[in-house]
From Swiss-Prot:
The gene is chlB. The active site is at residue 290. This is Light-independent protochlorophyllide reductase subunit B. Component of the dark-operative protochlorophyllide reductase (DPOR) that uses Mg-ATP and reduced ferredoxin to reduce ring D of protochlorophyllide (Pchlide) to form chlorophyllide a (Chlide). This reaction is light-independent. The NB-protein (ChlN-ChlB) is the catalytic component of the complex. Keywords: 4Fe-4S, ATP-binding, Chlorophyll biosynthesis, Iron, Iron-sulfur, Metal-binding, Nucleotide-binding, Oxidoreductase, Photosynthesis. Substrate binds at residues 425-426. It catalyses: chlorophyllide a + oxidized 2[4Fe-4S]-[ferredoxin] + 2 ADP + 2 phosphate = protochlorophyllide a + reduced 2[4Fe-4S]-[ferredoxin] + 2 ATP + 2 H2O. Gene3D superfamilies: 1.20.89.20, Nitrogenase molybdenum iron protein domain (3.40.50.1980), Proto-chlorophyllide reductase 57 kD subunit B (1.10.8.550). Signal peptide: none annotated. Disulfide bonds: none annotated.
């Protein structure tokens, strides 16, 4: 067990809560002590959802451990079914309750309810949140479809032709507390619709048990988030013959590749191939002269596997950055992240310790960090610009506006979120250079208006300035020195002048000529 201030993922029952809260007509009975009810805040505060999660806690206390906690579980299950009337019931236990070994899922199945009951056995001490979400989604699909898959033939992805209808796909993987999942779904549905493809079911987000039973009506599955949906997609492929996409449509190139993959699996002709690259502003900017400033910028990337791999591809192939660090906290995606890092000739960082990530960040010396809210705090301490690209996130990363990461509009959002911190850094750098120049006037009216006031006078500051002025006045610039100084570009002239005067003072020189300026340049490099 490790004590830490922050953690990238919660225990697996939080992942189960994410799936349950994303769906309709499902209820989750969680055998847990009173302290484990904190997870409600994740949905009401961070996700800013108008309703609390569909979860009933048994909330046992220390005094209950001396009695029959199994009866407490049964009572809560009965009350939840009678009150909420779910069409499917999930039953599981938190990390603390796992130690008691009451087996609430087995108890629920023996109580004679006429609704499907999904027994969630999530090993809290060896697995994490994303695995819990993936396993929960998989168990729901398996429970609701296990009888139907034996009654149907293997699904042909091209059957839409013989049925005389438009092709249909399922979009699998988006959940609450995922990174921009709601907006990603809208963007991908829009792209598919433009290609003449209908959406059959989106799950888990917004789906019901009836929708899960309709998954087999689609021709193929779109796996949007591998951490959540890949196991379910594999099960559907193995048992129903349903093909699924593997390309994540984040970035221009990946979005184009995604569209090609969908068309290829459906055997659907692609008619607007030449128009695809004009859907976003990112390619235009990458070809513009302004983007030259960004070429070769060092970037450090850390997040969940899906977003980290996609970010690395965009950074290298679409923005011309140099990726100096790539890693993930998701051990289920470690193999894919290592492969992506190998392509970049760097070593992947697989860890769930934010301190290790911060240490790697320091050693890499990046100019931009792309990570989670933890990396935002670390980058702030190190004075490096940062953009959040992955969960875990805070409320500021769940905007009320439309802000996807996937598709054409997602590329625009990424362009804004990544480029702006660097451009603002350039502005601060230029101001820092210009303020030393002769032509720079620091006394212009502030953009804050007339309310801006000067800092109060300080005797020590005045004395230091006076001493510095006396020292500067004691150094004489000769005509040859002044003439040589004017040849220095104005945006670095102030720094050269300052460095030369420091050099002259350190050497005890009474005047500065052209030779002194050359010597100072050689000294400071």
């Amino acid at each position: 067990m490790e004590l830490t201030l922050w953690t990238y993922e919660g225990p697996p029952h939080v992942g189960a809560m994410r799936v349950a809260s994303s769906m309709k007509d499902i209820h989750y009975v969680l055998h847990a002590p009173q302290g484990d009810t904190y997870a409600d805040l994740l949905f009401t505060m961070i996700e800013r959802r108008g309703q609390r999660p569909p979860v009933t806690y048994t909330t046992f206390q220390a005094r209950d451990l001396g009695g029959d906690t199994a009866e407490l579980v049964k009572r809560n299950i009965t009350e939840a079914v009678e009150r909420f009337k779910p069409k499917t019931l999930l039953v599981g236990e938190s990390c603390t309750a796992e130690l008691i070994q009451d087996q609430p899922g087995a108890l629920a199945k023996g109580m004679g309810f006429d609704i499907p009951i999904v027994n969630l056995e999530l090993p809290a001490y060896s697995k994490k949140e994303n695995w819990g979400a993936s396993e929960t989604f998989y168990q729901i699909i398996r429970t609701l479809l296990k009888d139907k898959v034996n009654e149907i033939d293997k699904i042909n992805p091209q059957r839409w032709k013989s049925l005389g209808r438009r092709p249909k796909v399922n979009i699998l993987g988006p959940t609450l507390l995922g990174f921009r999942c709601r907006d990603d779904v809208i963007e991908i549905q829009r792209i598919l619709s433009e290609q003449g493809i209908d959406t059959n079911v989106v799950a888990p987000l917004g789906s019901s048990p009836e929708d899960i039973e309709r998954l087999i009506d689609a021709d193929i599955n779109v796996c949007l988030y591998h951490e959540i949906a890949e196991i379910s997609c594999e099960w559907l492929k193995r048992n129903c013959g349903m093909e699924y996409t593997t390309t994540i449509p984040i970035g221009i190139k990946n979005t184009i590749n995604f569209i090609h993959e969908v068309h290829e699996k459906l055997d659907l002709p692609l008619t607007n191939k030449g128009e695809l690259e004009n859907k976003s502003k990112l390619p235009w900017y990458s070809k513009s002269v302004d983007s030259n400033y960004l070429t070769g910028k060092r970037v450090f990337i850390f997040g969940d596997g899906t977003h980290a791999i996609a970010a690395a591809k965009i950074a290298k192939d679409e923005l011309g950055f140099e990726v100096v660090g790539l890693g993930t906290y998701s051990r289920e995606m470690a193999r894919q992240v290592r492969a992506a890092a190998k392509d970049l000739n760097i070593e992947a960082l697989i860890t769930n310790s934010y301190l290790e990530v911060e240490d790697a960040m320091k050693k890499a010396s990046p100019e931009l960090v792309l990570g989670t809210q933890m990396e935002r705090h670390s980058a702030k301490r190190l004075g490096i610009p940062c953009s959040v690209i992955s969960t875990p996130m805070h409320v500021q990363d769940v905007p009320a506006r439309y802000s996807p990461q996937m598709g054409w509009e997602g590329a625009n959002v990424i362009f804004d979120d990544w480029v702006h911190p660097l451009m603002m850094g350039l502005e601060e750098h230029l101001i820092d250079m210009f303020k030393h120049d002769f032509e720079f006037v620091d006394g212009h009216q502030s953009h804050l208006g007339h309310t801006a006031t000067n800092a109060p006078d300080n005797k020590e500051t005045k004395q230091a300035q006076s001493n510095m002025n006396i020292q500067e006045k004691s150094i004489l610039w000769t005509e040859s020195g002044k003439a040589e100084l004017t040849k220095v570009p104005f945006f670095v002239r102030g720094k050269v002048k300052s460095n030369t005067e420091k050099y002259a003072l350190s050497k005890g020189l009474p005047e500065i000529n052209d030779e002194t300026l050359y010597d100072a340049k050689a000294f400071f490099g």
